[in-house]
Design a protein with these regions (language model features):
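Intrinsic-disorder-associated, low-complexity terminal segments enriched in Asp/Asn/His/Tyr and depleted
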Residues: 3-6, 12
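A domain-level signal for the structural core that forms small-molecule/cofactor-binding pockets
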Residues: 11-201
Length: 201
């Protein structure tokens, strides 16, 4: 059993976004809000937002593939606390949190950075948490592993800043392969919650 805790964020950029068009649209939005886009403090905002969106929505341009693997005999691999940021597709407000990811290799393991980039591929776009969790699990499982578990915990600003204005967090989970079995599912959940239960390699 292998256990990793991962907190580094890897930055990529959306290369196909029309920067000038985005700046124009943001300027028009500022006017519609009732503000002056030429005043100090706002004059460079369209450019800043266009630049930020290239990074925030880089998942659409991701060609990240889980093709690089290494021979390794391990029952399960657990990667904890993968930080992610995404944008709710309903209100275009952020939701963010951490993902716990586990998989059972079939004789080969993936590089840790590849799995982090897989999370970024599906989080850096207009999303809902439920679909993001499913997307990550499905792609990882499609690469020949015996089982996958993905648990995402997130704060949603669309719920905190508007509407019910509640600070509740949201947890979603997806299980594939052997981890769909009740006993295996319960076991991997306990390992994710309590890494001390891992056997020493």
């Amino acid at each position: 059993m292998v256990n990793y805790k991962y907190s580094k964020l890897v930055f990529d950029y959306c290369i196909y976004m029309d920067n000038e068009r985005v700046k124009k649209l943001i300027r028009e939005l500022i006017i519609e809000i009732g503000e002056d886009p030429t005043r100090e403090g706002l004059s460079n905002t369209p450019e800043r937002i266009a630049s930020a969106y290239k990074e925030i929505f880089s998942g659409y341009d991701s060609n990240s593939e889980l093709s690089v693997q290494f021979s390794e005999d391990s029952e399960s691999v657990v990667i904890r606390d993968i930080q992610f940021y995404s944008m709710c597709e309903h209100h275009m407000l952020p939701f963010f949190g951490k993902i716990q990811l586990a998989y059972s290799p079939n004789g080969r393991v993936f590089g840790i950075s590849k799995l982090v980039r897989l999370v970024e591929k599906y989080s850096r776009r207009l999303q809902i948490q439920e679909r993001m969790t499913k997307n990550i699990a499905d792609e990882l499982f499609s690469n020949g592993v015996k089982g996958v578990a993905v648990i995402a915990q997130a704060e949603h600003l669309c719920m905190k800043m508007r509407g019910v204005r509640n600070n509740a967090n949201v947890t979603t989970a997806a299980f594939r392969g052997i981890f769909e079995k009740k006993e295996e599912k319960e076991n991997i959940i306990q390992i994710i919650k309590n890494p001390s239960k891992l056997s020493t390699l």
